[in-house]
Structure formats: C-alpha cells, structure tokens
C-alpha cells in the first residue's frame, strides 16, 4: 500500500510538472515542508534566518537550498551551521531531493526512517549514536555515504552490500564492531572506503581484493588481526592503502608489489614479522612508505632504491639489521628518512643528501659507525639531523655549521672527536644543538653566544677545555644550557641581566672557581640550577632565595662558606635543595620546606646544626654569632616563633568558632553537610596563603565570571594574602559520582598540577569532596583571547598592533611545545581555542582549561568521544578518535587565523559548510589577494601585512588536512622566529619588503610539507 501511494505521488508530481499552476502549488508545498524542517532545528547562529515566509519568498534561494530546473528542491546543504535538534519526518515530502548534507553540526537524534531516496548523504561530524540505519530498496541508487565522526555502533550489516551504486563509503571515527561483511564484494563501483577509527575485529576479508574501482582504502586504527590477504594485490586502481595501528600480523605479502598505481602505503604500528618484500621495489609510483613500529627483521632490500618517486621512508622501531643500501642516496625525491631504533650497522652512504632534497634524517639508536657524510645538506633543505646513540666517529662535518636550514642537531652519545665547528651560532633557525656524550675537545665557539635562535644547548660529558664565553648565558631564546662533566674552568659569567628564557642551567662537574654571581637572580624563568662538583667559594647569594621559579638548586661538593640564607626555606618555588659537602656553618633555618629536608642534602658541612640536624652546641651558636649577625636574627626568630605559635593557637580557636557559625548559614549550610559534602580537601600544588574555607567563602553567584563546557568560573579575592584567584567548579553528573571516578580525576589533576611553564596557567590547587570538584588557578586580568580579538573586553583595545598579536601567538606556541615535548608523558590539550588562551596583566598568553586534556602515556590513544570545539577540531579527529599532538597543532593554526583575520572560526559570511581554514584556502585557489583577509585594524601598512602573511603561511601548514604534513610545535616556534616582526623606519620600508619577500619561501624549510592546499 505504501509503495502504491509513493508511486501515485510521484506520478502526479510528474503530471503536475507540465502545468505552471500545479508547479506553483508544488513549490508552496515544498516551502511549507522546509519551514516544517526548520521548526525542529535549533539554530543558535541564525544561519537559516532567510527561511521564512514573505511576499517574495523563493525557497530555492534560501541558505543551503538548491533546486532543479523544475523548481523542486534537489539538494539540502546545512553543513557547518552548529545546528542541533532533530530532522523532521516531513523531509520525506521533498520527493526530488537527491543530496542531503548536515555534516559538522551537533545532531544526536536519529534520522527519520522515511527519508526519501537519495544519491548523496553526508551526516559526518555529528553526535549520532545507535546503529547505522537500514537501507531499503529505495536506497539502491545511493552513490555517496559519509557518516564519519559520530558515535554510531553495532555491526556493519550485509545490507551495505546491496548499495551497488556506492562510490564513497566513509564510516571512519565511530564505534562499529565485528567483522567486515562479505557482501562488500558487490560494491564494484566503490572508489573510497573509509573505516578507520572503529572497533572492527576479525581478519581482513579477501573479497576486498575483488573491488576493481577502489582507489583509497583507509582501514587503520581498528582491531583487525591476521595477515594482509594477498588478494589485495589485485586492486589495480589502488592509490592509497592505510592499514596502520592495528593487530595485523604475519609477513607483508609480496603480492602488494603488483599495485602499480599505489602512492601511499601505511602499515605502521602492527605486529608484522619477516622481511620487507623485495617486490615492494616494483611499485615505482610509491611516494610514502611507512612500515614503522612492527617486528620486521632482515635487511633493507636493495630494491627499495628503485622507488624513484619516494619522498618518505619510515622503517623506525623494527628489528632490521645490516646496512643502508648505498644507492638510497640516488633517490632524487627523498625528503624524510627515519630508521631509528633498529639494529642497523655499517656506515651511512657517503653521498647521502647529495642528490635528494633531504629534510629529515633520523638514524638514532642503532649501531652505525664511521664518519658523518659531509653531503647531508647539499640541497640546503636539511632541518632535522638526529644521530644519537650510535658509534659515529671522526669530526663533525664543517658543512653542517653552514647549513642554514637546520633546526635540530642531535648527535649525543657517539664517539665524535675534534672540536665543535665554528658557525652553528650563525644558523638563524637552529634551535637545538645536542652534542653530549662524545669525545669533543677544544673550546666552546664564541659565535654560539651570538645565536638568535638556539633554545637548547647540551655539550655535557665531553672533554671541552675552556672558560665559558662571557655572554653565553645571554642568548635571548636560550632555555637550557648544559655543559656538565667537562673541564670548563674560570668563573661563572656574571652576565645574567638579559636571560629572559633560561630555565635550566647545568654547569656541574667542572673546575669552575670564584663565587656564585648574585645577578643570577635576575633569571626570572630559571627552574633548575646545578653547580655541584666545582671549586666555587664564597657565600650563597641571598638573592637566590627570591627567585620566583627556581625549583631545583644543587650546590653540593664545592667550598661554599657562610650560613644558609634565612629565607631559603620559604623561597617561592624551591622544592629540592642540596648543599652537602661544603663548608657552611651555623643553624639550619626551620622554616618552609627545610623543616622536612632530607639530612643527606645537608651532610658534609661540619659547621651546620639545628633543624633536621643535631641541635647546635653553645660553642656552635657562639661561633655563629661571632662570625655573623645571623645569630641575633635566629634568636629573635625563635622568640617570634614561640609568640606566633601561641597567637596561632588562639586564632585557631576563634576562627573555628566563627567558621562554624558561618558554616551553618553560608555556602555549605546544614543541608549540604547532611549530604556528605564535607569535609573539603585542598590539594596544593604551590605554597598557598589561603585555605579551603577562604575559597568556599567566595563561591557565590555575585562572583561568577564565566560558564563553559567544563564548569562555572568564580573570581575569588583572598583578603588575607591579597591574592586574586580563579576557581572553576567542575560539572559532574550523577553517574560520575556513582561510578566513583573522583580518585582517577584527582590523580590526573595532580599530574597537571606539576606543569611549570610561563605560558601555562598555573594550577594552584584542587579542592574536592565526595560530590564536588573545584580547580584553583591564577586569575588573568585581561580575560581570554577570544573576547580580546572579537571586542568583548578591554584587552581588545590593546591588541590593535601586530607585535602584540605575534607575541601572543609565540607564547601559545611555547606553551604547547612544553606540553607536547617536555612533559613525560606528553600532554595533549584537545581543546585549544582562543577562549582557552588567557591574557595576563602584560598581555602574555597563558594556555588554560585542561578539562579535556589527557595524559598520553602512549603515542596514540583512543578517546571515548569527540572532544573540542567546532571550528577548531582537526578533520581526522572525527574519523580516527585516536589523538596525538597533531590535533592541537591544527587547533593552534585556527587560532593563528583568528589573530590574523580578526574573524571567528565560523561566520555566515564564509558561506555554507565553510570554516575559516577553507575560507582562506579558497582565496588562494581563486587567486584573491590574501591582504584582503587580514584584519584591517592591524595590517594597515605594507610591511606589517608582509609580516602577517608569513605567519599566515604557518597557519596554513598547521591546518593541512593530513596530520603527518603538519609541523611539530618546535617547528612552529622556529618558523615564527623567521617571521618575527622587524620594525624599520619608513625610509627603509622598501628594503624591509624585499628582505621579507626573500624569506617568504624559507619559512617552509623547517617542515617536510610540499604545499599549502
């Protein structure tokens, strides 16, 4: 009966098309249907504002609506509009509809079962759950189905095999399980098959080898096991095969060598064994070959050198042996060669890099020997040279010290000798120079002090014999300088007045003499200072006790004299102090962490006493008093301490009485207490001048300053310590409480509380009980970056110049680089956006809101749901649900575009289904001047626009579609260094433009990326 009704309906629609009157009636009906569809949608950004009745209403011109020549709706494209709600059943009345796209929204409700026959359905990047809807005979004409990036589950049914017209099937990033249906063999027209990022199991079906039209097969990030079917070698049209990250095993079939069109082959992170098939060398079209993270054995086959189009070869983390085929240096397109963590031996090909645009060479943790080839940077593209943990001998090639593209040089733990070549300090992109654990001699080249880019220098465990260059510690970007275990002599340079970035200084185990310069206290970012095992004399400068970031101070095994500074125990951040085996005297202060310091960290000082050491004798006290005025202060301190204890006891009694009175009438009233929400526990990550009670007193509606996806934020003013805090009370569902997840969450927050970086909002503490959780962190005076850019707070008036915005971009990059590269395990934020970047009183950027962050103990980790914010989410996040640092880098790129354009990630002006990334890329494709995209409030003159365009290129690199093509955050920092604003007078503007134009292409030399689009 239903089929008859549909047939009659279609028949009358056809007859009606011959009559203008009936056509008009039909259009009115479709208009009503569209309004009915709109009525069940939630449209917070008002994208569908033109969907309304008016005297001139023509629904064919409405946003997202396309009609055929008869005036009937044939396409609905509502992608990227932030829509929620449900799709009305009335959509079934759009009988001419053939294409339906609601991707990148927030829909959760299932589609109506009465959806009309379609050729294209795109419901990707939503929150649909449940099983994939069943297909009726009316769906047999379906050509394009994209349901990626949802929460769909269940098994893939045999019904999918009935869609014989299907060309694109994209189900990536869901929770499908079970094995692949054998009916897939019926999909003879299928060109694209995307199933990655699910929980599919079983073996790969050999019937996939019967799909003659298949060009792209993305099946990785699943639980497939067993071997690769040799029948896969029959898919002659296959260009892209991704079977990465699974449980596949056995040998790689030699039949893959028959895939004459294949360009990308990804088999990394499986359990493949055996040797690399020599037949792989027959795939002359191959550009990307990644067999990393398996258990492959044997040698690298000589046939690999026949892959003349090969750009990337990654065989790292296997069990390969033997040497590198010498002819690999003849591959004219090779950009990336990663072989680290194998058992390879022999020498590197002597002309490696001579014929290829080599950008990235990593052969670390092998058994390579011989000399380092001098040709590695012949083409001028080498950015990363990583050779550590081998047995390379000879000298460091002088050609490397003139390689202007270098960003990282890591050669530690080899047998290199000779001196450090002069010239590394002149490489404007070089960030890391790691030469530790070799046999290098001579001195530290003086040009190192002139570097404008070096952030990490490690010359430890060598045989360097010289004094330190006087300005070595004043390198502007220097964060770590490590020269331990050498023969460095002379005094510690007294040139600390300009060390804005230095956080780690290790001069231990040398022969340094003289005193510790008091000017070292000017290094505001210094976290670790290690001067142990030297010949230092004099007293410990009391200025050290005021250093706001210093957490580790090791002065052991020297000849320091005098007393411990009284305030050293209450130093703002100090957590570890070792002054053992010196000549210190006098009582040990009993304040701060010195009350519980390990006595071993004080031993070897015969004159020290008191505190955690044995009590001071009268003789020691007299000696101490005679030798300095500190004795009087200590006696006064004891008297004041006794008085303070008495006063504190009285104050405690009074406070408890007053608090009980407040507690019965304030925030935590009797009702709350009766529900078990007491006691509150305060976990402190820093020394705090307030209590849980102080915080709770501020949690009231009048102090609320924000509300987000993770909780409510309150401003809390601590009158006792004149401190202003931000307190986030986290949302918690009843299920969370019943599941008892508090302990896990506390553990995670405890890890995050240990983060220390100037561009990360400091977590000061964590307040919790059985029902509620609150995170306490620094209050940022200038709010968040999103409001500043888009004009919602006063800080926006301070961001009208490019230098301020650039500095914010650089600060965020440093913060993310710390999370990704310096934390162990690394921290993936997962929700980088302008609203999660806070601005302090100096407009320095601080990354905030780790409500979605996860500590990544492994390189890849599955998450239970898509997190992040629309407009900032990386495209692969919807189909892999496996997160790594690349999703943060994409989001960072979007933030860069916000800073550059002054626009939000999603704006109606961009067009339907277009975000800011695509909006900019379209301008490039359409040859539209990119200056038009820049914020006119900032880029109002030519040289500023040129500087901004350099950063725009970095933003485009960060937002490339493929995660592997995105740079790391360390690369981003290097590129931003190239794009640093250079202010010149108007008379020099022409020269400025020319110099920037020359740098325009070099920005990309720090990342192996071929293009922007």
UniProtKB/Swiss-Prot annotation:
InterPro entries from the UniProt entry: Kinase-like_dom_sf, Leu-rich_rpt, Leu-rich_rpt_typical-subtyp, LRR_dom_sf, LRR_N_plant-typ, Plant_LRR-RLKs, Prot_kinase_dom, Protein_kinase_ATP_BS
Localization (cell): Cell membrane
Active-site residues (renumbered): 831
Outcome of gene disruption: Reduced procambial cells number, and adjacent or interspersed xylem and phloem formation.
Leader peptide range in chain numbering: 1-23
Family listed: Belongs to the protein kinase superfamily. Ser/Thr protein kinase family.
Protein name, entry field: MDIS1-interacting receptor like kinase 1
